[in-house]
Amino acid sequence: VYAPVLVEPEVLLPDNKACMRLPGIDGKAKMSKSLGNCIYLSDTADEVRTKVMSMYTDPEHLQVSDPGHIEGNTVFTYLDAFSKPEHFERYLPDYANLDELKAHYQRGGLGDVKVKKFLNNVLQEELEPIRSRRAEFAKDIPEIYNILKKGSDAAREVAAQTLSEVKSAMKINYFEDMDLIKAQSEKSVSYTHLRAHETLANLVC
């Protein structure tokens, strides 16, 4: 309406649908602290392993020889989100990729334990750098607050500049717009001059 100051943000969503929302390890709609079905970034390696091995899979996959379902199978949902070709090279070289692993599970002959162990290796590799970094930061809490303060100050500075541009576009930056101040000053002079003539005219009359 006023000026092209604010840019409409674009929606950014991952191509991998599994990344949009990970279900809880019990197969519920989402991870929930109250349900206790979360894997936390602060979890130890043992805690992650325990949670992965307790993950919800296919309730009908009772025997290794039974064909399994990957739809609604939490373990495969997590593998969709996190597994990479190099993970298979390191931890499961019998399979070239996730599609081959899924196909084997669906036709039967692949147990849940083997798939869960693979997922655990994948998650441990992804989480270890985060876990180590977090441990380093935890050694110096004042530095964390210092980093947060610097970030807040920088964000506040950018926000102030944006707000100034918005006010300028809306002509409400009364204390910064010199053109507006000049225009108001000229208007005030003209009004005062007019009132002065009215007063003199009234005196003459």
Where are these regions (language model features)?
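Short His/Asp/Glu-rich catalytic/ion-coordination signatures at enzyme active sites or charged loops
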Residues: 100-110, 129-154, 158, 162-181
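Active-site cores that bind ATP or allylic diphosphates and position pyrophosphate for catalysis
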Residues: 1-124, 183, 187-191
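Conserved small/polar residues in nucleotide/adenosyl-binding loops
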Residues: 192-199
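Hydrophobic alpha-helical segments, chiefly the membrane-spanning helices
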Residues: 204-205
